[in-house]
């Protein structure tokens, strides 16, 4: 495989990201690639050994994710972001997800090896809440609009309760603090 973009350049000086971009550009928009196929094409073009590719694979995958010119298309397929308009990217991903959800999968009956026909034993696997579509009905809460008269009556009742505990007359009295008593108590505690 030859890439026209790199004609006359030393292959050993090229990065895997540059080669990946060139390979995807050469293949065109409708030819997204699986990650493994992309890595194999890069290895073939650069002529690197399996061990060298394995060593640089984590860095390449990180670069592929962080480089803004690549886009994951699901199922480990990759393409160039320039191929897709922003709205089209969402549509492409959504259609892939819809294809997966098309046929519901049957759940297999779980077999418990410790329940040898014992009818009195409790099978806790049957109690899995994920197995049932359970929706708890929540009662709708209705709130009345705030009524200023209600608030006023609440404040008045609160004030009357406070006045029963401490009459307003007692609140106006000045309180005298005797500092000598405090000093004597501190001296007694130290002894």
From Swiss-Prot:
<feature type="region of interest" description="Disordered">
    <location>
        <begin position="117"/>
        <end position="191"/>
    </location>
</feature>
<dbReference type="Pfam" id="PF05066">
    <property type="entry name" value="HARE-HTH"/>
</dbReference>
<dbReference type="GO" id="GO:0000428">
    <property type="term" value="C:DNA-directed RNA polymerase complex"/>
</dbReference>
<keyword id="KW-0804">Transcription</keyword>
<dbReference type="InterPro" id="IPR029757">
    <property type="entry name" value="RpoE"/>
</dbReference>
<keyword id="KW-0548">Nucleotidyltransferase</keyword>
<comment type="subunit">
    <text>RNAP is composed of a core of 2 alpha, a beta and a beta' subunits. The core is associated with a delta subunit and one of several sigma factors.</text>
</comment>
<dbReference type="GO" id="GO:0003899">
    <property type="term" value="F:DNA-directed RNA polymerase activity"/>
</dbReference>
<dbReference type="InterPro" id="IPR007759">
    <property type="entry name" value="Asxl_HARE-HTH"/>
</dbReference>
<feature type="compositionally biased region" description="Acidic residues">
    <location>
        <begin position="117"/>
        <end position="136"/>
    </location>
</feature>
<keyword id="KW-0808">Transferase</keyword>
<feature type="domain" description="HTH HARE-type">
    <location>
        <begin position="14"/>
        <end position="83"/>
    </location>
</feature>
<comment type="similarity">
    <text>Belongs to the RpoE family.</text>
</comment>
<dbReference type="InterPro" id="IPR038087">
    <property type="entry name" value="RNAP_delta_N_dom_sf"/>
</dbReference>
<comment type="function">
    <text>Participates in both the initiation and recycling phases of transcription. In the presence of the delta subunit, RNAP displays an increased specificity of transcription, a decreased affinity for nucleic acids, and an increased efficiency of RNA synthesis because of enhanced recycling.</text>
</comment>
<dbReference type="GO" id="GO:0006355">
    <property type="term" value="P:regulation of DNA-templated transcription"/>
</dbReference>
<dbReference type="GO" id="GO:0006351">
    <property type="term" value="P:DNA-templated transcription"/>
</dbReference>
<protein>
    <recommendedName>
        <fullName>Probable DNA-directed RNA polymerase subunit delta</fullName>
    </recommendedName>
</protein>
<keyword id="KW-0240">DNA-directed RNA polymerase</keyword>
<feature type="compositionally biased region" description="Acidic residues">
    <location>
        <begin position="142"/>
        <end position="191"/>
    </location>
</feature>
């Amino acid at each position: 495989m030859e890439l026209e973009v790199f004609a006359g350049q030393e292959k050993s000086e090229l990065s895997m990201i540059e080669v990946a971009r060139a390979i995807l550009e050469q293949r065109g928009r409708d030819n997204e690639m699986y990650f493994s196929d992309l890595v194999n094409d890069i290895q073939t073009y650069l002529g690197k050994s399996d061990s060298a590719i394995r060593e640089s694979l984590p860095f390449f995958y990180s670069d592929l994710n962080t480089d803004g010119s690549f886009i994951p298309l699901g199922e480990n397929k990759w393409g160039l972001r320039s191929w897709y308009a922003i709205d089209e990217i969402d549509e492409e991903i959504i259609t892939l997800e819809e294809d997966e959800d098309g046929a519901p999968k049957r759940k297999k009956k779980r077999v418990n090896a410790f329940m040898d026909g014992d009818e009195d034993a409790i099978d806790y696997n049957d109690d899995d809440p994920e197995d049932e579509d359970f929706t708890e009905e929540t009662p709708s809460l209705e709130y009345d609009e705030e009524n200023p008269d209600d608030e006023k009556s609440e404040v008045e009742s609160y004030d009357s309760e406070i006045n029963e505990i401490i009459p307003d007359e007692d609140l106006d009295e000045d309180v005298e603090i005797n500092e000598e008593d405090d000093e004597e108590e501190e001296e007694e505690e130290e002894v």
